[in-house]
């Protein structure tokens, strides 16, 4: 199984699969086959709304700034969580 979180010189990279237009915004868990963190996002995938909601949600959960590295128009995204370690991300997201 590939972990959805990897160390990066500026923090931690998180591979995410987004399910937009969900009832609520919440973590669904890890898709072990794809090696991604599954996240439901209530916002629709229109004009970057789902991306903004994803980054704000992860930023609150991780208590840091998150930014989109790739996947702006895809369900699979790479997010950089700045200035937090892999262990901190795993702990704060309940991935242990």
From Swiss-Prot:
Family: Belongs to the UPF0235 family.
Domain of life: Archaea
Protein name (database record): UPF0235 protein MK0273
One Pfam family cited in the UniProt record for this chain: DUF167
GO CC terms: cytoplasm
NCBIfam families: DUF167 family protein (TIGR00251)
InterPro entries listed in its UniProt record: DUF167, YggU-like_sf
